[in-house]
């Protein structure tokens, strides 16, 4: 079994969960384990080498839906894609969607995922009304913002470590349709990025940018923003491509990085200005290429995603970009975004107010030295790293970024363990 970063492929005992009534008995006889949905965590949050994975994709039932309020009760293995496909034609949709539709409800809660609209809608956990949690000792806990709120805060963003999420009640929202009015604006440096962010947040629901992190061009980028289109068009048929093989070496490396970034810049500059597009290619551009993670070759890749407080962001982001450009490493898919002012609901939720930078790095010998330099800059700025994307964060960096970790540990289920939990907490 492996995760999306393809950094390892190690043996696990995999137990398929298909009946929520039987979950308690399964957990009692197969611990320690960790829930595994679609495996879209990039690092080791969903892995337990030598131990058990409880695969939740069989817990895929919709239990109840209130058409008048948008309240949806479903099992934890339901995929966000399927909720969107079923309810969007009925005028409802999820308020928060991450960069891929291929995430389970349980995974979205456990990682408290965010989307391009964080500045207006917060994180996924902000729209969860209740969670049914199964502990490995047999206890079942129902928690929410107004019921056992302490357990809710520990479970949202809790990396699956407080118990197995069996089902959840979600609040959907009214949506006019699948079409978005979008605008792409080129910017020359970080000052322009911050100006565009501040200008966009009141009127544009979605806002994100691609930034060039290569030497000589670091700081230029393309700012993309979107909101519901006034006129909703007809049917849309997306093209599904696939990456058929794993190349012998990463196609993203020091030789190709500069040309790929220049190509990306040139291709997307052709689309400056406003257009009407379907929400899927805007919100989930990489979903159009199945198995795109194979492009990084047999060694896989790391994603490094951090958030730093807004008051320190200008210097911190400039320092991070300079360190990356100076190293000769970098990313074709470097994403820069400003989060909103809302604090997230979970004790270990990532998306705090500030500015987030995310980059993919092919896994090569010596890359850890760059990560250590980036870690130092993030910690000095008062920031933190995103556990859902992480496979190597030192324990000290985790503790510095998540000051409520000690409080969270009181809610740990001792029968649940992952490679990440052992690396970052010792158990």
Language-model-detected regions and their locations in the chain:
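Noncatalytic alpha-helical scaffold of FAD-dependent oxidoreductases
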Residues: 1-427
């Amino acid at each position: 079994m492996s995760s999306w970063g393809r950094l390892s492929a190690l043996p696990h005992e995999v137990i398929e969960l298909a009946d929520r009534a039987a979950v308690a008995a399964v957990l009692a006889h197969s611990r320690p384990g960790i829930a595994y949905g679609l495996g879209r965590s990039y690092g080791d949050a969903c892995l337990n080498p030598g131990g058990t994975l409880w695969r939740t994709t069989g817990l895929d039932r919709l239990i109840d839906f209130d058409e008048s309020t948008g309240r949806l009760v479903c099992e934890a293995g339901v995929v966000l894609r399927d909720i969107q496909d079923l309810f969007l034609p009925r005028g409802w949709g999820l308020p928060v969607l991450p960069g891929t539709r291929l995430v389970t409800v349980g995974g979205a809660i456990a990682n408290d995922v965010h989307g391009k609209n964080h500045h207006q809608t917060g994180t996924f956990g902000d729209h969860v009304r209740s969670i049914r949690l199964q502990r490995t000792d047999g206890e079942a806990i129902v928690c929410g913002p107004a019921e056992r709120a302490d357990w809710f805060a520990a479970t949202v963003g809790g990396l699956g470590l407080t118990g197995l999420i069996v089902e959840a009640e979600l609040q959907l929202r009214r949506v006019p349709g699948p079409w978005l009015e979008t605008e792409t604006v080129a910017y020359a440096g970080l000052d322009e990025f911050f100006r565009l962010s501040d200008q966009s947040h009141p009127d544009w629901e979605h806002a994100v940018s691609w930034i060039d992190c290569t030497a000589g061009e670091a700081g230029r980028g393309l700012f993309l923003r979107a909101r519901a289109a006034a006129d909703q068009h007809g049917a849309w048929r997306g093209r599904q491509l696939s990456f058929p093989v794993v190349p012998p070496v990463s196609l993203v490396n020091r030789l190709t990085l500069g040309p790929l970034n220049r190509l990306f810049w040139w291709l997307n500059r052709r689309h400056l200005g406003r257009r009407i597009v379907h929400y899927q290619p805007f919100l989930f551009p990489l979903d159009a290429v199945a198995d795109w993670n194979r492009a990084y070759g047999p060694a896989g890749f790391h994603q490094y995603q951090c958030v730093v407080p807004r008051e320190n962001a200008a210097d911190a982001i400039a320092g991070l970009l300079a360190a990356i450009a100076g190293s000769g490493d970098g990313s074709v898919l470097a994403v820069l975004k400003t989060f909103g002012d809302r604090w997230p609901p979970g004790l270990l939720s990532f998306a705090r107010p500030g500015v987030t930078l995310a980059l993919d790095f092919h896994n090569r010998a010596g890359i850890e030295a760059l990560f250590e330099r980036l870690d130092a800059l993030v910690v000095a700025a008062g920031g933190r790293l995103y556990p859902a994307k992480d496979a190597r964060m030192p324990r000290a960096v985790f503790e510095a970024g998540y000051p409520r970790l000690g409080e969270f540990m009181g809610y740990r289920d001792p029968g649940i363990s992952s490679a990440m939990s052992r690396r970052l907490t010792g158990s």
